[in-house]
Swiss-Prot record:
Xref: Pfam families: Homeodomain (PF00046)
Protein name: Homeobox protein Hox-A5
GO cellular component: chromatin; nucleus
Entry annotated with the keyword DNA-binding: yes
Length: 270
């Protein structure tokens, strides 16, 4: 054993100077000193602490024997009044494992009892709340059915009153007289202003009949205009406009013809 290890042990504990090792040859004196120190320090540090083990890593042929170690551990165990399950040896190589307690000997702690009691109370309260919720839902369903029956009664009474009352007569259609209708309907008003008149496209038969009538008489009377309008399925206004346009064209043609004839006659004048 080195003096450095012993000096460090003496400086760590308050009663270290009382247990300085001066005799390195006597095994019994050294074991007795360490046995007393273990018994004194075990109560101070708790859990069966038996001081510092100075025989770590030593073989059986070292300074301390196995019998001395057994006696020192026995003295430390008798000095420590702690329970066997709380005793912790310094090293696992010098003391056996404590026997585990049987399951029957382990009594439930009051904390676990209170925990189980809290769980039971929670389960009971949840069951009571579920029962209350079911009764509340059933009561609400009962109220809903009652209110639905009350709502059905006024609806049926309203239907009966509606059936008993006579239905109002539909509004009469306004009567349309013949002069209100358009005789010649054209769909050329798309995209144009409302007051603009659409261009009327005449058929070949209508144009031929109008040309023959214009050849006989360039001006029409009111009676003849009505006859032509009924014969050609046209309106009087359309007949009048066609004759106006045809006369303008005839005057233009005659004017050009007369101007050309006058120009031709002046050229041949000597």
């Amino acid at each position: 054993m080195s003096s450095y290890f012993v000096n460090s042990f003496c400086g760590r504990y308050p009663n270290g100077p009382d247990y300085q090792l001066h005799n390195y040859g006597d095994h019994s004196s050294v074991s007795e000193q360490f046995r007393d120190s273990a018994s004194m320090h075990s109560g101070r540090y708790g859990y069966g602490y038996n001081g510092m083990d100075l025989s770590v890593g030593r073989s059986g042929s070292g300074h301390f024997g196995s019998g001395e170690r057994a006696r020192s551990y026995a003295a430390s165990a008798s000095a420590a009044p702690a329970e066997p399950r709380y005793s912790q040896p310094a090293t696992s190589t010098h003391s056996p494992q404590p026997d585990p307690l049987p399951c029957s000997a382990v009594a439930p702690s009051p904390g676990s009892d209170s925990h189980h009691g809290g769980k039971n109370s929670l389960s009971n309260s949840s069951g009571a709340s579920a029962d209350a919720g079911s009764t509340h839902i059933s009561s609400r369903e009962g109220v809903g059915t009652a209110s639905g029956a009350e709502e059905d009664a006024p609806a049926s009474s309203e239907q009966a009153s509606a059936q008993s009352e006579p239905s109002p007569a539909p509004p009469a259609q306004p009567q349309i007289y013949p002069w209100m209708r358009k005789l010649h309907i054209s769909h050329d008003n798309i995209g144009g202003p409302e007051g603009k008149r659409a261009r009327t496209a005449y058929t070949r038969y209508q144009t031929l009949e109008l040309e023959k009538e214009f050849h006989f008489n360039r001006y029409l009377t009111r009676r003849r205009r009505i006859e032509i309008a009924h014969a050609l399925c046209l309106s009087e206004r359309q007949i009048k406009i066609w004759f106006q346009n045809r006369r303008m064209k005839w005057k233009k043609d005659n004017k050009l013809k007369s101007m050309s004839m006058a120009a031709a006659g002046g050229a041949f004048r000597p």
